[in-house]
Amino acid sequence: MDKMMKALESMNKLDRENDYFITRKAGEYILIKVDKDGYGWKIGFANCEVMIRKIIMGIYGELWYKSVD
């Protein structure tokens, strides 16, 4: 979870237009993107951290994770 949270921090630093959050509801992790006007979108959801990580990497590429290491 720590690496995933660091990746979210780097996504928020690199993407000045949007903010990204992970929340947990009913046992599922939900990745949410919120734009500068306050509108939010569910980008993806999964029941484990590994799948959320794959969603982030699938959408934004490995750059987000490499910048954290």
Spans of features found by a protein language model:
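Acidic, low-complexity, intrinsically disordered interaction modules
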Residues: 17-63
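Negatively charged, low-complexity tracts enriched in Asp/Glu with abundant Ser/Thr
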Residues: 1-17, 63-69
